[in-house]
């Protein structure tokens, strides 16, 4: 198995590219290695299916737990469906690749990245993105690459290129930028309320680094003697497009310029124009070229009409500065926000509406045991904040089967989750696990940013003490040559017919999340900077409207939310609280009707719907873990009696024993002659033996009731008070 390995020196590290050794039947394959991380990426092309009018591209990212020396924890001990983070990596590969394929391509394309080995110092996702470009070029697929991706972190005041997992966790920025020689094609970022200028600088820093990887790919192709296949659009028959442009331009423009009409009226108006065109074509002579072309292809008329509508709408924006709903380029749609729209049995709820986009978000508070365990390669195995996004078909007036969440739903949910994470309270001050669910009730663009706004409303209604409220806006772009217009708060038709979908979320202080997808082959960082800066006043305007609904987190939780008490104990005493076989902690939970979680760090969290019960459980645990010293005095009750002595509960959950010889100064024949179960006594700690057992005494300790001294002729002793 011969192969060729080439090395790239990149930011002080060595990236190794091995070609010709693995997956010989794939169209193109490359093993990308850095440190001990190794990702095999393949690209394969097969003949397209009939009737396809889109690019059938599939990007998969496969994780194997053997890459980290682990065996899956499932019953079958085999990897099941891809975990959420693997799905997000699939999208991370797909988003910069898709705009670089020619729009006319209809062949089935599949890119598969498999993580074979993982070094925690070198995350695999950006290697997979760069590897996807290399494999595609090696496969000879028409592609406007090379393309590469890097991650940028921020530690203190310094940008870090391709940081480790630990550095990502510690830093204030986690930004992935992908680009070509022409410009940026994809950005994905989470930030700790960073100013716009810092984020733009980070994008520029990453884009400059990408150029080295692009040059390395060009060198690789040259060394292998492979010529890149550049997309060349096939000649299209312009008969139908030319006919529609002549017959329908005026009618379409009239519909698009009715700024006061509703989305439904505009859609119906365009459908009517298309129907008239179809009727006119059907009335043409049978040998007419237009009629014959439409008859030979069921989708030709629809696609040509859609292309003409796109062209006219873009011209209206570029020339007149007017959008289909009459807004200016930097104008936000009408905003409506409400908090507490559902009964308090739902811990928190918020309803956010922007134009025809409406999102209902709910917040649920849970206990530490409700945290999501992540069985994947990522070193962070637990999630304390979860956001789930649902997009039912009725939100766009359609019918289709309701199935489990797809990649889009998972991706949108993760973006809204990322936007909120930086403003969540610290675990020590608010130990709840929080789940937010965003139900998209109506969609006309920017539902993910609507979910961010809805999440903020729901969390504040639930009483979660956010560091700052967060809002979001989606920006768009229309580009024809050097003529560029940036659109604020794009709606569905502008997203579909535009060149960019750029989502920006953040607080008044700065950005918390960023996501940019392009439909063109690259955008200069300078234009991106304009979009980021134009998004800020839009975000703040939306935030102002949200704060009119609820200006701060509620001071009290829902009566149906669990009450949590959190405190710290010595980690070495965790075993004392748990007890042999878990008997001690089980007894505490049964006695107090609470739920108790103990972390390895010693943080104890008690959950209960009754605050008094939680406090009782806390006292018991504190008693179990409190250090007892010789000579200390305690008051407690007799819990049990054995022939050689009596046990006293000196602290909640902690007992000591009074030996029969320590019950009195006089000789005692029978323990019951002095005390019985339930008696309240004051004792002194006589000693703590080498096994940690607490030995107590009554001798010389004044009691609050009758004397414990035994008369020469023993008589029954009254209970001690």
From Swiss-Prot:
Q: Which reaction does it catalyse?
A: RNA(n+1) + phosphate = RNA(n) + a ribonucleoside 5'-diphosphate
Biological process, per Gene Ontology = mRNA catabolic process; RNA processing
Q: Name one Pfam family in it.
A: KH_1
Classify the main location. Answer: cytoplasm
Places the protein is found: Cytoplasm
Annotated S1 motif domain ranges read 631-699
Q: What class of enzyme is it?
A: transferase
Q: Give the cofactors, semicolon-separated.
A: Mg(2+)
Residue runs in coiled coils: none
Where is each KH domain found?
562-621
Q: Does the keyword RNA-binding apply?
A: yes
- Name the UniProt key words of this record, in alphabetical order: Cytoplasm, Magnesium, Metal-binding, Nucleotidyltransferase, RNA-binding, Transferase
Q: What is its EC number?
A: 2.7.7.8
- Region span, Disordered: 700-721
Q: Does the keyword Transferase apply?
A: yes
> Which GO MF terms are attached to this record?
3'-5'-RNA exonuclease activity; magnesium ion binding; polyribonucleotide nucleotidyltransferase activity; RNA binding
Q: Which InterPro entries does this one have?
A: ExoRNase_PH_dom1 (IPR001247), ExoRNase_PH_dom2 (IPR015847), ExoRNase_PH_dom2_sf (IPR036345), KH_dom (IPR004087), KH_dom_type_1 (IPR004088), KH_dom_type_1_sf (IPR036612), NA-bd_OB-fold (IPR012340), PNPase (IPR012162)
Instruction: Please tell me where Mg(2+) binds in this chain.
Output: 495, 501
Query: Which GO cellular component terms, listed alphabetically, does the Swiss-Prot or TrEMBL entry include?
Result: cytosol
Q: According to its UniProt record, which protein family does this protein belong to? A: Belongs to the polyribonucleotide nucleotidyltransferase family.
Known function: Involved in mRNA degradation. Catalyzes the phosphorolysis of single-stranded polyribonucleotides processively in the 3'- to 5'-direction.
Q: Which NCBIfam families match?
A: polynuc_phos, PRK11824.1
This protein is called Polyribonucleotide nucleotidyltransferase
Report the source organism.
Synechococcus sp. (strain CC9902)
């Amino acid at each position: 198995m011969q192969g060729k390995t080439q090395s790239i020196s990149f930011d002080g590290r060595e990236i190794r590219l091995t070609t010709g050794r693995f997956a010989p039947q794939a169209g193109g394959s490359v093993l990308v290695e850095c440190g001990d991380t190794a990702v095999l990426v393949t690209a394969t092309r097969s003949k397209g299916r009939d009737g396809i009018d889109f690019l059938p591209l599939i990007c998969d990212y496969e994780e194997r737990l053997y890459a980290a020396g682990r065996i899956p924890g499932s019953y079958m001990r085999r990897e099941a469906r891809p975990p959420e983070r693997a799905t997000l990596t699939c999208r991370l590969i797909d988003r910069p690749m898709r705009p670089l394929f020619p729009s006319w391509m209809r062949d089935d394309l599949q890119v598969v990245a498999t993580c074979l080995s993982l070094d925690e110092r070198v995350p695999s996702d950006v290697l997979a993105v760069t590897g996807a470009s290399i494999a595609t070029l090696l496969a000879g697929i028409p592609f406007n690459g090379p393309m590469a991706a890097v991650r940028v972190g921020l530690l203190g005041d310094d940008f870090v290129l391709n940081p480790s997992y630990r550095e990502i966790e510690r830093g204030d920025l986690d930004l992935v930028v992908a680009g070509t020689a022409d410009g940026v094609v994809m950005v994905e970022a989470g930030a700790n309320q960073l100013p716009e200028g810092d984020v733009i600088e980070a994008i520029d820093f990453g884009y400059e680094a990408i150029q080295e990887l692009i040059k390395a790919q060009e060198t690789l192709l040259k060394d292998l003697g492979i010529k890149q296949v550049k997309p060349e659009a096939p000649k299209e028959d312009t008969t139908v497009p030319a006919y529609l442009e002549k017959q329908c331009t005026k009618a379409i423009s009239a519909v698009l310029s009715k700024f006061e009409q509703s989305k439904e009226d505009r859609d119906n108006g365009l459908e009517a124009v298309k129907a008239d065109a179809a009727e006119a074509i059907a009335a043409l002579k049978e040998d007419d070229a237009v009629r014959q072309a439409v008859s030979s292809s069921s989708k030709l008329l629809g696609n040509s009409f859609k292309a003409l509508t796109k062209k006219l709408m873009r011209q209206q924006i570029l020339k007149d500065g007017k959008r289909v709903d009459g807004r200016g380029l930097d104008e936000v749609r009408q905003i409506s926000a409400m908090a507490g729209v559902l009964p308090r049995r739902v811990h928190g709820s918020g309803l956010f509406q922007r134009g025809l986009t409406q999102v209902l978000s709910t917040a649920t508070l849970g206990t530490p045991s409700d945290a999501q365990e992540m069985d994947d390669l990522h070193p962070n195995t637990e999630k304390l904040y979860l956001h789930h996004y649902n997009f039912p078909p009725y939100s766009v007036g359609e019918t289709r089967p309701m199935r489990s969440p797809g990649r889009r739903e998972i991706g949108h949910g993760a973006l809204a989750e990322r936007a909120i994470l930086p403003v969540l309270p610290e675990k020590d001050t608010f130990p709840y696990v929080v789940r937010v669910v965003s139900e998209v009730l109506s969609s006309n663009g920017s539902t993910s940013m609507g979910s961010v706004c809805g999440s903020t409303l729901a969390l504040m209604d639930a009483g979660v003490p956010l560091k700052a409220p967060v809002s979001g806006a989606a920006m768009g772009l229309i580009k024809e040559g050097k003529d560029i217009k940036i659109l604020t708060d794009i709606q569905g038709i502008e997203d579909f017919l535009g060149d960019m979908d750029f989502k920006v979320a953040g607080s008044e202080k700065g950005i918390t999340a960023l996501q940019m997808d392009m439909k063109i082959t690259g955008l200069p960082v300078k234009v991106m900077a304009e979009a980021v800066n134009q998004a800020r006043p839009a975000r703040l305007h939306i935030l102002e409207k949200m704060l009119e609904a609820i200006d701060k987190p509620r001071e009290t939780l829902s009566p149906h939310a669990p009450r949590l008490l959190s405190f710290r104990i010595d980690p070495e005493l965790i075993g004392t609280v748990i007890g042999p076989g878990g008997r001690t902690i089980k007894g505490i939970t049964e006695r107090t009707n609470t739920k108790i979680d103990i972390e390895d760090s010693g943080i104890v969290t008690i959950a209960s719907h009754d605050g008094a019960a939680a406090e009782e459980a806390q006292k018991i645990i504190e008693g179990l873990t409190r250090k007892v010293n010789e000579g200390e005095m305690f008051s407690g009750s007799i819990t049990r009696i054995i022939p050689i002595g009596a046990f006293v509960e000196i602290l909640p959950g902690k007992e000591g024993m009074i030996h029969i010889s320590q019950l009195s100064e006089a000789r005692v024949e029978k323990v019951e002659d002095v005390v019985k179960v339930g008696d309240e006594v004051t004792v002194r700690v006589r000693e703590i033996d080498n096994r940690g057992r607490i030995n107590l005494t009554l001798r010389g300790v004044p009691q609050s009731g009758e004397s414990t001294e035994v008369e020469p002729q023993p008589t029954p002793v009254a209970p001690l008070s």
